[in-house]
Amino acid sequence: MAKQKSTWFDTPKSGFGYASKFYYKVFQSISQDESLSLDSELPPMKTTWFLTEKKMQAWLDLTGYDLSYPQAFTFSAPAGVWALMQVLKEIGISFGRIMHLSSRLLMINKDGFQVDEHYSTYVHYLGVKPHSKRAVMIRFLSVVKNVRGQDIMHLEDELYVAGLDEEFVAQLDMKGLAPERRNTKALLTNNPMADSIQLTIGRSLGQKYGKLSGDLNPMHISSIGARLFGHKSSFIQGLCTLNVIVAELGRHWKSSIRSVEIEFLRPVSQPSKPTLLCTLDHFELVDREGNLLVSGRYICSN
């Protein structure tokens, strides 16, 4: 990754002010002409934030986590969401086009995040990867550091961009990058070594996560908002799903979940009662019909 000077940005603080600016950017991106500069080289974006005890407790309450083992919760999400909005504008992608495909999360500091600490988040746009003839994946890396410059967490996200022109996709510089095939069938359902955990996804979980993370995408706030984007009902955010799973695995094994690789295959509806299946290093989330919603790998440690 070439060394580039960071671009500073501020994340809006107030609830109403943030929501107003967020939805303004959403509808602005929908109405604007797409320039589709997906292979742009953008400088990293930087912001700082402060983790209060109240904010920490709000994240714990969201996931129902009450143990002392530090977990890889995405406290830095508000910075990442706002940076994503800026980058989407720079590369000319409408907000309504994207869908979260996968995340890779690594908590580098074994003590995790600390209350009453200042942190910096650097968001890097990593470019584009092939998906299919008319779709690609765009990639982002968020690096969170403390005031001493130590890396606390790395989070890499892949977003799906569909409905592109075949000729446009063909001319992108993606040499040597082959499309990745994803398994869409549950493998742990009949595995005798897998534990089974019943989850309850509340009707307003996406809304609660949105208020904490800044991801106020209408698809996750209400069924009406979801239908505006062509979905039958609302579903929780990808990183909301990740945080819920991290909490459940940490509680189940009574240890810290330090590393997670997760693929989002089908929406996790709200409300719903999916089942989390897990072995010592793999997990799957399935619905009542046995459809695979989410799958991934993880590492836990004490």
Predicted segments with their positions:
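Short, structured beta-strand/loop micro-motifs enriched in basic residues and often containing a Trp
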Residues: I98-R104, S256-E261
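Glycine-centered flexibility motif
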Residues: G163, G214, G238, N243, ...
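A conserved acidic, glycine/proline-rich C-terminal tail/linker
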Residues: E248-T275
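HotDog/MaoC-like acyl-thioester-processing domains
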Residues: M1-I30, S35-S37, L101-I201, P267-Q270, ...
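Hot-dog-fold acyl-thioester-processing enzymes
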Residues: A2-S102, L187-H252
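Short flexible/disordered coil segments
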Residues: P130-H131, F229, V260
